[in-house]
């Protein structure tokens, strides 16, 4: 990819507020600045993501994270957002076919050229991430609309950064694996775009403030500056049976 406009209309599909900023905040900011249409979908409101119950009371976290995501998307320049409305931590136990059809309806409505989501392992191993990946794959297979791209880790990145992310508690399941095939998007963010991504993540303070305080601003910028995706062809056979 030589020009962000090559991605056309972008639909990004994620599990929790802050997933979008961590994994494709730079892409969305660049595309929005280039006047491309960008639509973000979030499956849950992240109401279980308690990091400091005194500062961000659990009973208020759903509302807090809604507001944080709204500010994050404003900073990124994204004006279209859809909630799927599922419970945090429960995506792998709901009716997968209903979720797939909900996403498929959004795909048909938006008619994206590019669809961004998690890799098969969910990146962090979180069950919600893995479920959203599976739903997205099947929604694209059913609709035949757009090209699906999944977040991709290179071996170089894993060697350089995985230990740090694990130490910070970001990996909740099996560690991510290296992507063996070619990359369709390979960005190293610098300058204003990295500043925007940093600000967007800082806006989600209930999730990022503690990490930023531990590692420091410069190290945090190093952790968030890479955005890599690989084209992912949906299976030709339905995959919903594996998701129930």
Roles of regions detected by a PLM:
Residues 1-111, 137-142:
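Active-site rim/loop-helix segments in enzyme catalytic domains that contact anionic ligands
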